[in-house]
Every structure is written in structure tokens, then in C-alpha cells.
Curated annotation (Swiss-Prot):
Pfam families: Asp_decarbox
Assigned keywords, A-Z: Autocatalytic cleavage, Cytoplasm, Decarboxylase, Lyase, Pantothenate biosynthesis, Pyruvate, Schiff base, Zymogen
Gene from which the chain derives: panD
Family: Belongs to the PanD family.
Record-annotated active site: 25 (schiff-base intermediate with substrate), 58 (proton donor)
GO molecular function per UniProt: aspartate 1-decarboxylase activity
Physiological role: Catalyzes the pyruvoyl-dependent decarboxylation of aspartate to produce beta-alanine.
Protein name: Aspartate 1-decarboxylase
């Protein structure tokens, strides 16, 4: 039986910008996407640590090395520039193949502080 499990997470990223009039999505620095094993147009759950809001959206790539985290569309009304967010991607796994999520921990400058492979 397959189960939906946490695949990867970018923990405590800082929102650098938001655009209500853009068609939707979360823009993420391509370097972070590569390190986290996330892909453009992948479905993600985003949790705002500052206000508790959660929303589902999809990823669009931002320039590699830009350190940008940009919330677009209607979800931009749920966050403020400078808020810290947790970005979570999920996958479907057989219980015997799941090894745990990859976790990217960020600092306040959107620099990677630690990369962990959590075990189950």
C-alpha cells in the first residue's frame, strides 16, 4: 500500500517578496529547489510561522543564488514580507521504500545552515 509522506522541507525560509496580482504560486531560488529535491510546478504546503496560516500552492523557479522566496496570487494576502515559512513537499511511497524526508534549515538571510536526511 502506498502512503503520502513528507518528501522534503525547506524550514524557516524568509519571505523576500509577495505579489497579489501574479497568477499564483511560490517562487523559490533554484539552488534551494535542487538542494531540497523539489521541482518547478510541484505541489507544496506552505506554513507561515509568524501567523499560523497554511496554504497549498505550486513552485515556480526563481534565479539560482537569488535567495528569493516570493508568494504570489491570493496566498500573498496570507503572508507579509519578512515572515518565516516552512515549505513542504510530499510523495507517495511504499512503506518499505520510505527513508524519511530531506530537511533544509535556513537562517534569516535565506542561507542554508544545515541539510539533514531524517530517518524513520
Amino acid at each position: 500500500m502506498q502512503e503520502i509522506m513528507l518528501k522534503s522541507k525547506i524550514h524557516m525560509a524568509k519571505v523576500t517578496d509577495k505579489s497579489i496580482n501574479y497568477m499564483g504560486s511560490i517562487g523559490i531560488d533554484t539552488e534551494l529547489l535542487e538542494k531540497a529535491g523539489m521541482k518547478p510546478y510541484e505541489l507544496v504546503l506552505v506554513a507561515d510561522v509568524n501567523n499560523g496560516q497554511r496554504f497549498v500552492t505550486y513552485i515556480i523557479p526563481e534565479e539560482k543564488g537569488s535567495k528569493k522566496i516570493v508568494i504570489n496570487g491570493a496566498a500573498a494576502r496570507l503572508v507579509e514580507q519578512g515572515d518565516r515559512v516552512i515549505i513542504m513537499a510530499f510523495g507517495m511511497y511504499d512503506s518499505n521504500e520510505y527513508k524519511g524526508p530531506k530537511v533544509i534549515i535556513m537562517n534569516e538571510k535565506n542561507e542554508i545552515v544545515e541539510i539533514k536526511q531524517e530517518g524513520v
